[in-house]
Amino acid sequence: AAVPASASGVLLVDRAAIAENYRILKAAFLEKAVAAVVKADGYGLGAEQIVPSLVRAGARSFFVAQLDEALKLRPLLDRCHPAIALYVLNGLTPGTETLFADNTILPVLNSLGEIEAWSRFAQQRGTAQPAAIHLDSGMCRLGLPPDAVERLRGNPGALDGIVPTCILSHLACAEEPDNPKNAEQLAYLKQALTALPRAPVSFCNSSGIFLGRDYHFDLGRPGVALYGVNPTPAAPNPMRPVVRLLARILQIRAIDAPQTV
């Protein structure tokens, strides 16, 4: 590809490589279900261009960070396939319940307050509402902390009207296979799951997929590895490169070695 005369550079995005990376990750996940994280406009590479390739490669669940991202992608996903689950990682903000429900978008419930609001909305509508529930197993970013999980254990009615489609958590140090934090999070997650209704579990991010079968559960959730970033920094990159930058050379000069540049 040539650099247009009006541009100083061009970034090429290889959608076939993204699809191949999805297949590589699915194989590493032992051919179980693998979602695709396409937040921040597909990590800046263009979600609307990337999503159809991922659907053709087999992705049936997608994660974004913000509701506005999901609202933009929902029509495209519906055109690509009739049964695509679309999750919003940043959860349910006040007043957005109807937008989620009417557009078939699934909130990831990160707090007891969000669970209460979604349950109340379901009861007002008179129909059960699907959602994911996020447990903080040690990342300390989003999700229900241990005390909130124990409150749910003691009050299962808090989930009235909610159909958990997925229970997720996030590994903090998966790119370091020998980090004891990984095993600590796994042990806590197994214990915390006993407080909740049975549902598919999503624990593995890109690097987590390569930690092995014990960490896999039901649904992989890779992000950066889809776009060519090495999920195993201590080993060769198993992913195909996705982006290539072409830049125009502005000037070539010969100078003497003592001169500064």
Q: Where on the chain are the PLM-derived regions?
A:
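Anionic-ligand-binding alpha/beta catalytic cores of soluble enzymes and soluble regulatory domains
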Residues: D178-V261
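N-terminal nucleotide-binding beta1-loop-alpha1 segment
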Residues: K26
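Active-site-proximal beta-alpha core segment in soluble small-molecule metabolic enzymes
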Residues: A5, G9-V13, A17-A19, F29-Q191, ...
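Short, basic/glycine-rich phosphate-binding loops at helix/coil junctions
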Residues: A1-A2
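Alpha-helical scaffold segments that flank or form the walls of functional sites
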Residues: N21-R23
